[in-house]
């Protein structure tokens, strides 16, 4: 079982690649010793969506900003200034990734990407899975032997290519 006192913090090597809001949010999260799950429960969002917000990869609503201000004890005006714009997605880390867990996810796409594509094309036709009309979640499973397994669900709207 994971130690519940451990929380994810901001890797200092990423700070220059992330918006200023990331530093603000992560520092407040660490000060309060909050998990993404606990923040997500307060916001009514998934923990992955909240983590993406902290990394500047998703947009905060006015309600998110108000609740984050309360949860993290950060002035609402500061969060409005830092989170009020549009996210600059996809620039958080180097490509290919060097962080081992992120590299494993990249490796999954490298190894199974064409297999996923072939199966999805057979099931849905010619098109793509949206990463905009999209949701994801991470769950923990424990098997009969006590081994922990990570279960990542990716759910994206199917978008058929247009014929023109």
Curated annotation (Swiss-Prot):
Keywords carried by this UniProt record: Lyase
For this protein, what is the EC number? Answer: 4.2.1.104
Q: Which Pfam families match?
A: Cyanate_lyase (PF02560)
Q: What class of enzyme is it?
A: lyase
Task: Quote the InterPro entries the UniProt record gives.
Answer: Cyanase (IPR008076), Cyanate_lyase_C (IPR003712), Cyanate_lyase_C_sf (IPR036581), Lambda_DNA-bd_dom_sf (IPR010982)
What the entry lists under Gene3D superfamilies is as follows:
Cyanate lyase, C-terminal domain, lambda repressor-like DNA-binding domains
Give the reactions, separated by semicolons, that this protein catalyses: cyanate + hydrogencarbonate + 3 H(+) = NH4(+) + 2 CO2
Gene Ontology biological process terms in this record: cyanate metabolic process
SUPFAM superfamilies in alphabetical order: Cyanase C-terminal domain (SSF55234), lambda repressor-like DNA-binding domains (SSF47413)
Work out whether the entry's keyword set contains Cell division. no
Which pairs of positions does the record mark as disulfide bonds?
A: none
The source's superkingdom equals Eukaryota
Give the positions the UniProt entry annotates as the active site. 104, 107, 130
Q: Any idea which GO molecular function terms this record carries?
A: cyanate hydratase activity; DNA binding
Q: Which family does it belong to?
A: Belongs to the cyanase family.
Stated role: Catalyzes the reaction of cyanate with bicarbonate to produce ammonia and carbon dioxide.
What is the name of this protein?
A: Cyanate hydratase
Classification of source organism: Eukaryota, Fungi, Dikarya, Ascomycota, Pezizomycotina
Q: Which gene encodes it?
A: cyn1
């Amino acid at each position: 079982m994971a130690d519940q006192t451990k929380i994810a913090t901001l890797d200092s090597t990423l700070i220059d690649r992330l918006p200023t809001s990331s530093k603000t949010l992560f520092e407040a999260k660490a000060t309060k010793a909050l998990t993404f799950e606990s923040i997500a429960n307060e916001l009514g969002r998934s923990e992955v969506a909240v983590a993406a917000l902290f990394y500047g990869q998703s947009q905060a609503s006015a309600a998110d900003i108000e609740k984050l201000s309360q949860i993290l004890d950060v002035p609402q005006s500061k969060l409005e200034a830092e989170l009020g714009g549009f996210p600059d997605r996809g620039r958080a880390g180097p490509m290919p990734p060097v962080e081992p867990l992120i590299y494993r996810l990249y490796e999954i796409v490298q190894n199974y990407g064409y297999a996923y594509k072939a199966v999805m094309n057979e099931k849905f036709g010619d098109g793509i899975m949206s990463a905009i009309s999209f949701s994801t979640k991470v769950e923990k499973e424990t098997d009969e032997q006590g081994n922990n397994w990570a279960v990542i669900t990716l759910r994206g709207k199917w978008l058929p290519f247009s014929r023109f």
